Amino acid sequence: MEGKVIGIHGPVLDLQFTDYTPFERELIKVRDILVECRALLGEGKVRTVALGPTEGIRRGDKATALGKPMTIKVGEQLIGRVLSGIGAPLDQKEEPEGEERSVFNVPPQVTAVLPVSTVLETGIKALDLLAPFPRGGKIGLFGGAGVGKTVLVMELIHNVAIKHRGYSVFAGVGERTREGQELWEEMRESGVMDHLVMIFGQMNEPPGVRAITPYAAATVAEYLRSQYGGEILLFMDNIFRYAQAGMEVSTLLGRMPSAMGYQPTLFSEVAQIEERINSLAEGAITSVQAVYVPADDITDPAPATIFGHLDSSVVLSRALTEVGIYPAVDPLQSSSKMLDPEVVGYNHVQVAGRVKEFLQRYEELKDIIALLGMEELSPEDREVVLRARKIQMFLSQPFFVAEAFSGAPGKYVPLERTVEGFKAIIDGKLDHVPESALYMIGDISEAGVDV
């Protein structure tokens, strides 16, 4: 099971074996790094992708096939640990112990998957009202650079993981090391690390590591689900970087690119991860995924492919960040399959629908207001605009994880109070209250109104 290096192309190594042919995805050791077999070239030649730095490797170096795919050790010892995408410790502690599991598990059978029928309360008004999260489903947070995806993920971890007190897994895929450090500190200080496993494949890692990190995180989440049952939370920041790493690997392997330079297997690669996130009889995995949108183009092939797998989609708007509305959730583009009378109740659906109607009409009137002013509007339209602006202000909310920067204490708003607050605005009960009184507050009672 030994061969040698016959070619080096950055993170791609070509190997030659004489009496053995490695299988697809088999791990091979070259010096002190692992490489993964990704293409069989014939006559004992294979093309591999490195899972570590290739500096210093020479042609002729020995390669040893390990006879197994990428595995990660799972067990109770993982709780509270910070690991790399290949399972190595990043928290200056010893190597984790436990049962080795392949990261390439098969998704559950169709008949084993349970339907998603209950809502997960987040305490964030814009999300709970307009894009309620499903328990045991998949949620995507879409947005370009700098619109607040990571902050929103951190707030969700704070609100949901602390309140939920079950086990959670965080996968940092292709993001900044600084953000990973900040998140680790935040989770440690809040006590969430006692119920959390963190797995990082950061942006400085080779594409092979970034591409394999979501598989490792999904494997740990599946283990926790089977071992402890209940609900497991799986956070991914950023799932787009997984698709991007796959594009890099595909290009390095010499495959013909498809639209926008993406790998031809983009759809199936995304499905391999997404289809493993499900509700089963033994427990459920609820996944929250940040999705970077290149150049704010939601029709880009990667976000568009990910979108098709989601139960709830939250779109973050740059226009809202420019006017200081945080979280910058676009109420007209965000949606959820949970917004159904049989799931959340008729009152919730009606209030959410009317909120969207007010905001949509306000968008249509903006050009007229800019040209002619509010005075030229009919009394009915003027009323719509005033209430829509108050709705927009009330959609803002101070976050716990941003307290150090904003100076405002974070607020958690129960779902029932969220619906009551927006209903009061659209019914005109706050017509006498100035817009500013609704900006960056939690419960509607903070505006001085009892509803």
Swiss-Prot record:
Keywords: ATP synthesis, ATP-binding, Cell membrane, CF(1), Hydrogen ion transport, Ion transport, Membrane, Nucleotide-binding, Translocase, Transport. It comes from the Bacteria. It holds the Pfam family ATP-synt_VA_C. Its EC number is 7.1.2.2. It is a peripheral membrane protein. Signal peptide: none annotated. PROSITE patterns: ATPASE_ALPHA_BETA. GO terms for molecular function: ATP binding; ATP hydrolysis activity; proton-transporting ATP synthase activity, rotational mechanism. ATP binds at residues 143-150. Belongs to the ATPase alpha/beta chains family. This is ATP synthase subunit beta. It comes from Coprothermobacter proteolyticus (strain ATCC 35245 / DSM 5265 / OCM 4 / BT). The gene is atpD.
